[in-house]
């Protein structure tokens, strides 16, 4: 063992990080029809034009909170991969228990 801890085999020497593309405006990937479909599933019949940007903003804040908590669980476990259970625990912490993904 080369003293790299667990998972240290075959991963190279762990040199400099590669430049990662900065992600911007990905929230626009949540399209108007996608928001409309979610609203239809929730029983909405008619949708105001102002709803779409508002929905994107709310969804962004919600996902940021869940992902922050999930990554915190992952880092505490000294892992590099966020698992489904990390997300389940993050949602449970926020009072939104999710069933069907283990645990």
UniProtKB/Swiss-Prot annotation:
Region (Disordered) residue spans: 1-20
PTM sites of type N6-acetyllysine: 17
Entries under Gene3D superfamilies matching the protein: Histone, subunit A
GO cellular component terms listed in the entry, alphabetical order: nucleosome; nucleus
Keywords, in A-Z order: Acetylation, Chromosome, DNA-binding, Methylation, Nucleosome core, Nucleus
SUPFAM superfamilies: Histone-fold
Source superkingdom: Eukaryota
Primary location: nucleus
DNA-binding region: 17-21
Annotated InterPro entries: Histone-fold (IPR009072), Histone_H4 (IPR001951), Histone_H4_CS (IPR019809)
Biased composition (Gly residues): 1-14
Molecular function terms, GO-annotated: DNA binding; protein heterodimerization activity; structural constituent of chromatin
Coiled-coil parts of chain: none
Residues modified as N6-methyllysine: 21
Chain positions with N-acetylserine modification: 2
SMART domains: H4
Keyword Cell division (UniProt): no
Modified sites of kind N6-acetyl-N6-methyllysine: 6, 13
Record's subcellular location: Nucleus; Chromosome
Assembly notes: The nucleosome is a histone octamer containing two molecules each of H2A, H2B, H3 and H4 assembled in one H3-H4 heterotetramer and two H2A-H2B heterodimers. The octamer wraps approximately 147 bp of DNA.
Summary of the function given for this chain in its UniProt record: Core component of nucleosome. Nucleosomes wrap and compact DNA into chromatin, limiting DNA accessibility to the cellular machineries which require DNA as a template. Histones thereby play a central role in transcription regulation, DNA repair, DNA replication and chromosomal stability. DNA accessibility is regulated via a complex set of post-translational modifications of histones, also called histone code, and nucleosome remodeling.
Entry's family note: Belongs to the histone H4 family.
Descriptive protein name: Histone H4
């Amino acid at each position: 063992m080369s003293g790299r801890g667990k998972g240290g085999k075959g991963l190279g020497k762990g040199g400099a990080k590669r430049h990662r593309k900065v992600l911007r405006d990905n929230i626009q990937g949540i399209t108007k029809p996608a928001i409309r479909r979610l609203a239809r599933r929730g029983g909405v019949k008619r949708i105001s034009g102002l709803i779409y940007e508002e929905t994107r903003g709310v969804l962004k804040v919600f996902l940021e909170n869940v992902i922050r908590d999930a990554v915190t669980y992952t880092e505490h476990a000294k892992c590099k991969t966020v698992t489904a259970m990390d997300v389940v625990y993050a949602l449970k912490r926020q009072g939104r228990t999710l069933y069907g993904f283990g645990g």
